[in-house]
Amino acid sequence: MFACDELLLNASTIDATGLQLYNQAIVIRKGRIEWCGSEDQLPVHFQESAKSRKDCHGQLITPGLIDCHTHLVYAGHRAAEFRLKSQGVSYADIAKSGGGILSTVQMTRDASEEELIDQSLPRLLALKNEGVTTVEIKSGYGLDLQNELKMLRVARQLGDMAGVRVKTTFLGAHAVGPEFKGNSQAYVDFLCNEMLPAAKNMDLVDAVDVFCESIAFSIRQAEQIFQAAKNLNLPIKCHAEQLSNMGASSLAARYGALSCDHLEFLDENGALNMVKANTVAVLLPGAFYFLKEKQKPPVDLLRQVGVGMAIATDSNPGSSPTTSLLLMMSMACQFFSMSIPEVLSAVTYQASRALGMEKDIGSIEAGKIADLVLWSIKDSAALCYYFAYPLPHQTMVAGEWVS
């Protein structure tokens, strides 16, 4: 009888705050971390009776990376709009001519589930190939009952096909469905009374998100949706304070939000309310870069008051067409002046908190699922130093090496 399935020796690791630890050992048993700590404190019975052992030669092991904010299920692309923007055409003019989010909605509606899988699976596999083991995927390009459910079904299937843990978020409140043009309140009522309960009844949704902004949904409408989610025992998230300060972060915190995302215009009151609610700030440097934003999220304020910060790709066709979480990590350092430990924690422990999964994943601790990445580097700073470079690595998911 073996004491463990796998024994990883002579490794460096990171703790939940992103600090690097050296001379570490990790014991894996039945898909979970049985023990971890300094190698000189490793219990003798694990040393003497391990089914398999690996000398890591001082290389870095991190938790499996977590992309906690994506919109990667969609059809088509918006490269033509990118060309127009490069020629000086405004987003408003593009939207008036039928472009913008509603163009993606139409292409996604027109696509079958099989076509959505064919187009979206490569995006998920690209994340997996960077050491990402858990991904959040939002709906929001259907904007009617049939197509929102279609997107959520595809997201579930993608996780099974790619061998990646997928958490689904219902984002019917991404924009007003075109059938309800000029009557956003009727759309919100339909969303709360029909769409969200159907997604819940089919077990397709893990959380509920709202884009609360002057160009999307009002504070009052966001609260109506949050209350509907609460009535269904679903946790909430919020696209908040991206373009202006509407108080969405404080509202979301009042409902115990897992995360508020974007946050370029967050103020101190919103940040303090997020702290009280243990709400994570999810920062999205890809959108900041692609949209040429000038207003940065208030990292110093978040740091000062103690709001946990996560980083994600925001993978989507309109404002962040990327599938590289490693690139986002480098951008977070360069654009947002986050420290190396902050960024490493942002894509592991803090990202797990943003999904409500911190009890199972996100850090190297006894009892947690053994999602790990063994990198071909010894200095943790290298994960943020390189950009657009595929660092060699091996990935373990639930105790099994998958690459």
From Swiss-Prot:
<protein>
    <recommendedName>
        <fullName>Imidazolonepropionase</fullName>
        <ecNumber>3.5.2.7</ecNumber>
    </recommendedName>
</protein>
<feature type="binding site">
    <location>
        <position position="319"/>
    </location>
    <ligand>
        <name>4-imidazolone-5-propanoate</name>
    </ligand>
</feature>
<feature type="binding site">
    <location>
        <position position="78"/>
    </location>
    <ligand>
        <name>4-imidazolone-5-propanoate</name>
    </ligand>
</feature>
<keyword id="KW-0378">Hydrolase</keyword>
<keyword id="KW-0369">Histidine metabolism</keyword>
<feature type="binding site">
    <location>
        <position position="71"/>
    </location>
    <ligand>
        <name>Zn(2+)</name>
    </ligand>
</feature>
<dbReference type="InterPro" id="IPR005920">
    <property type="entry name" value="HutI"/>
</dbReference>
<feature type="binding site">
    <location>
        <position position="141"/>
    </location>
    <ligand>
        <name>4-imidazolone-5-propanoate</name>
    </ligand>
</feature>
<feature type="binding site">
    <location>
        <position position="316"/>
    </location>
    <ligand>
        <name>N-formimidoyl-L-glutamate</name>
    </ligand>
</feature>
<keyword id="KW-0963">Cytoplasm</keyword>
<comment type="function">
    <text>Catalyzes the hydrolytic cleavage of the carbon-nitrogen bond in imidazolone-5-propanoate to yield N-formimidoyl-L-glutamate. It is the third step in the universal histidine degradation pathway.</text>
</comment>
<dbReference type="Pfam" id="PF01979">
    <property type="entry name" value="Amidohydro_1"/>
</dbReference>
<dbReference type="GO" id="GO:0019556">
    <property type="term" value="P:L-histidine catabolic process to glutamate and formamide"/>
</dbReference>
<comment type="similarity">
    <text>Belongs to the metallo-dependent hydrolases superfamily. HutI family.</text>
</comment>
<feature type="binding site">
    <location>
        <position position="239"/>
    </location>
    <ligand>
        <name>Zn(2+)</name>
    </ligand>
</feature>
<dbReference type="InterPro" id="IPR006680">
    <property type="entry name" value="Amidohydro-rel"/>
</dbReference>
<feature type="binding site">
    <location>
        <position position="141"/>
    </location>
    <ligand>
        <name>N-formimidoyl-L-glutamate</name>
    </ligand>
</feature>
<feature type="binding site">
    <location>
        <position position="318"/>
    </location>
    <ligand>
        <name>N-formimidoyl-L-glutamate</name>
    </ligand>
</feature>
<feature type="binding site">
    <location>
        <position position="314"/>
    </location>
    <ligand>
        <name>Fe(3+)</name>
    </ligand>
</feature>
<feature type="binding site">
    <location>
        <position position="69"/>
    </location>
    <ligand>
        <name>Zn(2+)</name>
    </ligand>
</feature>
<comment type="pathway">
    <text>Amino-acid degradation; L-histidine degradation into L-glutamate; N-formimidoyl-L-glutamate from L-histidine: step 3/3.</text>
</comment>
<feature type="binding site">
    <location>
        <position position="242"/>
    </location>
    <ligand>
        <name>4-imidazolone-5-propanoate</name>
    </ligand>
</feature>
<dbReference type="GO" id="GO:0008270">
    <property type="term" value="F:zinc ion binding"/>
</dbReference>
<dbReference type="GO" id="GO:0019557">
    <property type="term" value="P:L-histidine catabolic process to glutamate and formate"/>
</dbReference>
<dbReference type="InterPro" id="IPR011059">
    <property type="entry name" value="Metal-dep_hydrolase_composite"/>
</dbReference>
<feature type="binding site">
    <location>
        <position position="174"/>
    </location>
    <ligand>
        <name>4-imidazolone-5-propanoate</name>
    </ligand>
</feature>
<feature type="binding site">
    <location>
        <position position="69"/>
    </location>
    <ligand>
        <name>Fe(3+)</name>
    </ligand>
</feature>
<feature type="binding site">
    <location>
        <position position="71"/>
    </location>
    <ligand>
        <name>Fe(3+)</name>
    </ligand>
</feature>
<dbReference type="GO" id="GO:0005506">
    <property type="term" value="F:iron ion binding"/>
</dbReference>
<keyword id="KW-0408">Iron</keyword>
<feature type="binding site">
    <location>
        <position position="239"/>
    </location>
    <ligand>
        <name>Fe(3+)</name>
    </ligand>
</feature>
<dbReference type="GO" id="GO:0050480">
    <property type="term" value="F:imidazolonepropionase activity"/>
</dbReference>
<feature type="binding site">
    <location>
        <position position="314"/>
    </location>
    <ligand>
        <name>Zn(2+)</name>
    </ligand>
</feature>
<keyword id="KW-0862">Zinc</keyword>
<dbReference type="InterPro" id="IPR032466">
    <property type="entry name" value="Metal_Hydrolase"/>
</dbReference>
<keyword id="KW-0479">Metal-binding</keyword>
<dbReference type="GO" id="GO:0005737">
    <property type="term" value="C:cytoplasm"/>
</dbReference>
